[in-house]
Design a protein with these regions (language model features):
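Short glycine-rich, polar/acidic loop-and-turn segments at beta strand-coil junctions
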Residues: 32-36, 268, 278, 290
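Generic alpha-helix signal with a bias toward terminal, lower-confidence helices
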Residues: 102, 175, 219, 264, ...
Length: 298
């Protein structure tokens, strides 16, 4: 993240997504992965605030970003003070530069440890690097400050946090992109994946690694958010596939008098899946209320 990006069209989608979690009672911790402004024109796309055609999606957020964009020398502290992410914590220290490769590595390690201390009471940590995930996992590389390292993602997840980090497709072809999205899910195979991609302006993706115990709750938040923002966000799948359909408990099987077997299963997203052996290629998916209404006819 750079201060020059603040309030651009990408920020609207980003803060709306994080706000969905914060307003649902999830304690969000933001590590900006802050880097120096570079003098480029990136982050200048704020005219959407003047047009106003996207305001209806999240009016309170839209209006707050409009206030901030009119300030001179706006910084991430303006976001932190605005309250757009209720109850959120922040780590705003810039990623250290300078020195030999070994010195940069040591500085990076200390910086990251400080971030965990600052965000210790978070449930979901959002990491906002400039360019996404550095697959090589090498903090000594040139421009590594623009990336989150796989070791850092794993450290957060193993520390009990759910994690979401920013990345973008760039020039990757489809196969390379799916492999890239799958990197952390292959490394942390007990994490439940979700990937939401924002299509307004430059494509931006948000990769979630969710603990099993929180997956149903987080899926509910994501689904509710996406039902409103579906024109601008799409869900992408990694090589693992769509884990929302995974069965989480032993199925309940009913044998009918005509010989058919009806199987009732609970899915990872909390919905109920019903299959009939006489029609094995199709199944019915219901939420809990729909299931109860069908059973009790109320």
């Amino acid at each position: 993240m750079k201060n020059q990006y603040l309030c651009d069209i990408g920020d609207y989608g980003k803060y709306a997504l994080m706000r969905a979690f914060a307003t649902a009672g999830v304690k969000v911790g933001v590590n900006w992965y802050l880097t120096e402004d570079d003098g480029s024109k990136d982050g200048k796309f704020v005219d959407y605030l003047e047009k106003g055609d996207l305001r209806w999606l999240c009016p309170d957020l839209f209006d707050e970003l409009t206030k901030i964009v009119n300030k001179k020398n706006r910084t991430i502290q303006d976001i932190e003070k605005s309250g757009i992410l209720p109850g959120a914590g922040y780590f705003s220290e810039q990623i250290p530069l300078g020195g030999t490769p070994d010195e940069r590595l040591q500085k990076r390690v200390r910086w990251f440890e400080k971030s965990l201390e600052a965000l210790a009471d978070a449930e979901l940590i959002f990491a906002d690097p400039d360019n996404g995930l550095l697959v090589s996992d090498n903090a000594k590389e040139k421009d590594s400050e623009k990336y989150i390292l796989p070791a850092e993602v794993e450290r957060m997840f193993r520390g009990g946090y759910n994690v979401v980090y920013y990345c973008h497709k760039g020039r990757r072809q489809y196969k390379a992109w799916v492999e890239y999205l799958s990197t952390m899910f292959e490394r942390i195979d007990d994490a439940k994946p979700a990937v939401l991609t924002y299509h307004k302006g430059t494509q931006r993706s948000y990769v979630f690694l969710i603990h099993k115990k929180d997956f149903q709750k987080y899926r509910g938040i994501i689904d509710t958010f996406h039902s409103r923002w579906y024109r601008l966000f799409s869900e992408e799948y990694t090589e693992i596939g769509d884990v929302t359909r995974e069965v989480t408990e032993a199925p309940f099987v009913v044998k009918c008098s005509d010989g058919a077997e009806v199987t009732i299963e609970k899915r990872a997203d909390g919905k109920i899946q019903i299959k009939n052996s006489k029609n094995p290629t199709t199944y019915l998916v219901l939420d809990a209320d729909q299931f109860c209404r069908r059973v009790w006819m109320y």
